[in-house]
Curated annotation (Swiss-Prot):
Lineage: superkingdom: Bacteria
Origin species: Pseudomonas fluorescens (strain SBW25)
Region listing for Disordered, in residue ranges: 1-23
Descriptive protein name: Small ribosomal subunit protein bS20
One Pfam family, short name: Ribosomal_S20p
UniProt key word Ribonucleoprotein: yes
Gene3D superfamilies: Ribosomal protein S20
Record lineage: Bacteria, Pseudomonadati, Pseudomonadota, Gammaproteobacteria, Pseudomonadales
Coiled coil: none
Any one GO molecular-function label of the UniProt entry: small ribosomal subunit rRNA binding
């Protein structure tokens, strides 16, 4: 447990940052989930619209260090790949 006043302050700051970062990570997951739901409905336009909303949020969180930049790139790439697969007619 923190004993000095500065250590107590740092512990308080760390807890505040942790909870704020957790809410931001949750927000990113929600945006990603919305895109995945739109993809699952096989609606390319709706999925694209959700993707367009999600990309700046994902990028912003990667810039702030909330999620790793490679993880952000991976999410964007996979979501975009699924959306493109919806747009291309299935080979019969």
């Amino acid at each position: 447990m923190a004993n000095t006043p500065s250590a107590k302050k740092r512990a308080k700051q760390a807890e505040k940052r942790r909870s704020h970062n957790a809410s931001l990570r949750s927000m990113v997951r929600t945006y990603i989930k919305n895109v995945v739901k739109a993809i699952d409905t096989k609606d390319a336009e709706k999925a694209q619209a959700a993707y367009v909303l999600a990309v700046p949020v994902i990028d912003r969180m990667a810039d702030k260090g909330i999620i790793h930049k490679n993880k952000a790139a991976r999410h964007k790439s996979r979501l975009n790949g699924h959306i493109k697969a919806l747009s291309v007619p299935a080979a019969a």
